[in-house]
Amino acid sequence: MKTVCGVFMVLLALTVLLAYLPGNTVEAGSCSNKNCVSSCQGSGNSSGKCINSKCKCYPRG
């Protein structure tokens, strides 16, 4: 019983750490609208949007 409780506490602590530390979310690897718009505008496009975790740039004109 002591071992089961210890394992449960360790798993709980790891879950809390992963949930509240920055940079550990699934979205960290994907694009965000702010990054996408500035990246697209920097490459000469008029705008951009994050679709399915990928940047979609819209050309000028």
From Swiss-Prot:
The keyword Disulfide bond is annotated on this UniProt entry: yes
Lineage: Eukaryota, Metazoa, Ecdysozoa, Arthropoda, Chelicerata
Hydrolase in keyword set: no
Free-text tissue specificity from the UniProt record: Expressed by the venom gland.
Protein name: Putative neurotoxin-A
Cellular localization per UniProt: Secreted
Signal peptide from the UniProt entry: 1-19
UniProt keyword list: Disulfide bond, Ion channel impairing toxin, Neurotoxin, Secreted, Signal, Toxin
Major location category of this protein: secreted
Entries under PROSITE patterns matching the protein: SCORP_SHORT_TOXIN
Pfam families hit by this protein: Toxin_2
Molecular function as annotated in GO: ion channel inhibitor activity; toxin activity
Top-level taxon in the UniProt lineage: Eukaryota
GO cellular component: extracellular region
Gene3D superfamilies: Knottin, scorpion toxin-like
Membership in a protein family: Belongs to the short scorpion toxin superfamily.
UniProt xrefs under InterPro entries: Scorpion_toxin-like_sf, Scorpion_toxinS_K_inh
Disulfide partners: 31-50, 36-55, 40-57
